[in-house]
Amino acid sequence: ALSMMLIPGSLVFLFGRMLKTKLQIHPHAIMIFVAMFVMFIGFLVTCLYFEFAGNPVLHHLGIAGGNMEGKETRFGIGLSALFTTITTAFTTGTVNNMHDSLTPLGGMVPMVLMMLNAVFGGEGVGLMNMLIYVMLTVFICSLMIGKTPSYLGMKIEGKEMKLIALSFLVHPLLILVFSALAFIVPGASDALTNPQFHGVSQVLYEFTSSSANNGSGFEGLGDNTVFWNISTGIVMLLARYIPIVLQILIVSSLVNKKTYQQHTQDVPINNLFFSSVLIIFIILLSGLTFLPDLMLGPIGEQLLLHA
């Protein structure tokens, strides 16, 4: 588990070293790491809670205990939930338990982590995606206080915001459009092994994992068909290269700008307040994007268990 975390986590500090002329870590990078770490711990605690809580339907039948379905006894619930959270936060794709057998909200944790694709994320790509959220946060906060948006002494203007918005939208568009196609294309939905809320979760997870280049899946989905193999391959290809190209264009636009010394009127990016605001904006932006689909999937399934 630790080996999966080292490189993506250390790249945040590498970014901090690159911002400093001396051999020091820029405090802005530390604040980004704090935001990532707090969100990671929050998702881990959520997954642990719902997995140890178990299945309400079984509790009504007098069968107490956590959710051990799909898990090896040598790992148990705790280590399985930990591995699940790490492998999807750091997008490695390895598994030590069946994600399809997680409780609805326990299974929503890896799904949401891949939807964000920025809580550490993959090597390099996770940091790039987080910087998109950072620039969106700086832009919105600057407008809220009536200041010219700027990041690290470089003004964020219309051209950059268009590219930032496009880069932000690629990931959810690929997930949602191809998930919709899975229910529209004749025969594609035959792969579903669950006709209700969990079937929606299986489809969402499949394309979320493909778009995040993760590799794990809700393996109850019979996805070894022409539609699923081709569609997930297209999603992997587009989700990998389009954001990278857009982010390179953002960087090339910013580096050609005249930089200036940051002053007190700018949005502060080197304190815990910025980390808190960054977390809030990530939750708000992602919630507005994915919450309706999560309601049709894991959240609806959890409510059904309590019905």
UniProtKB/Swiss-Prot annotation:
Record's signal peptide:
none
Record keywords, A-Z: Cell membrane, Ion transport, Membrane, Potassium, Potassium transport, Transmembrane, Transmembrane helix, Transport
Q: Does the keyword Protein transport apply?
A: no
Q: Which GO terms describe its cellular component?
A: plasma membrane
Source species, domain of life: Bacteria
Q: Which GO terms describe its molecular function?
A: P-type potassium transmembrane transporter activity
Ribonucleoprotein is among the record's keywords: no
List locations, semicolon-separated. Answer: Cell membrane
The entry's family comment says: Belongs to the KdpA family.
* Name of this chain's protein: Potassium-transporting ATPase potassium-binding subunit
- What lineage, starting at the top, does this entry show? Bacteria, Bacillati, Bacillota, Bacilli, Bacillales
